[in-house]
Regions:
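Flavin-dependent oxidoreductase catalytic cores
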Residues: 1-243
Length: 243
């Protein structure tokens, strides 16, 4: 059978994505909270070795009929963490700007070379809302202010590598979710933001708008608009009208 048919069969196979008890570990296990779990440092060799896996995944996606792939660079997952790796000393993936963006740029370049007819894009954190030197896209003196100098520099590189569109986001949904997902009432156990949701939403709009105006030829897709509820279409229309 074709690769697409084989993938579909696997997805529809219940046992493919769920192991019946007894099991020793589950995909959802969070080892961060596990007692005596040793956090393993991701050495440079390990990070460099990830690039072929991205290429393999992109190759399979194209063979399965996909037109594009999204290389995640947001919400403090691996690539996002590296963008803010100011304190990673003596590493090809930390410190200087060129080092911190290295993994993402290397992955994009490798995927483009291996699958040239596959559209490549990313969901990119523009502003982590974490104090420097732990946050990307933040003002070094005041973390409540965004500084998009480096994010825009990265976007220019990604466009040179063939990006035609980009999805923007900010903050970390697991740590400071109100920045990227404004809400009225926090979930149980979550903090209460010290600002009105409209302020959070307006900040997100301003940050995304700065990127769109800096790169008018780039299709910029915003996020975090759901708080506007029934007014979302009106807001979207106004944003498009105002560029």
């Amino acid at each position: 059978p074709s690769l697409a048919a084989a993938l579909k069969a696997k997805i529809l196979d219940f046992k493919y994505w769920w192991t019946e008890p007894p099991i020793t570990e589950t995909p959802g296990a969070n080892y961060y909270w596990t007692e005596n779990h040793q956090i393993i440092f991701a050495a440079d060799e390990y990070l460099a070795g990830l690039v072929p896996y991205y290429v393999r995944a992109a190759t399979l996606a194209r063979a399965a009929g996909f037109d594009a792939v999204d290389i995640k660079a947001c919400h403090r997952y691996l690539v996002s963490e590296l963008l803010a790796s100011f304190t990673r000393e003596n590493s090809r993936y930390g410190g200087a700007f060129e080092n911190r963006v290295r993994l993402l740029v290397d992955v994009v370049r490798a995927v483009r070379d291996a699958v040239p007819d596959l559209e490549v894009s990313s969901r990119l954190n523009l502003y982590d809302a974490l104090e420097y030197p732990y946050g990307w896209g933040v003002d070094r003196e005041e973390m409540t202010r965004a500084d998009l100098t480096e994010p825009k520099r990265l976007i220019a590189q990604l466009m040179a590598l063939g990006y035609h569109g980009l999805n923007t986001t900010i903050g970390n949904p697991y740590y400071n979710p109100h920045f990227g997902r404004p809400f009225d009432t926090p979930i149980t156990g979550m903090y209460t933001p010290q600002e009105h949701p409209l302020e959070s939403f307006a900040r997100f709009i301003r940050i995304t708008a700065e990127v769109q105006r800096a790169f008018p030829d780039l299709a910029v897709v915003g996020s975090g608009h759901s708080w506007m509820r029934q007014f979302y279409p009106n807001v979207a229309a106004a944003l498009i009208e105002q560029g």
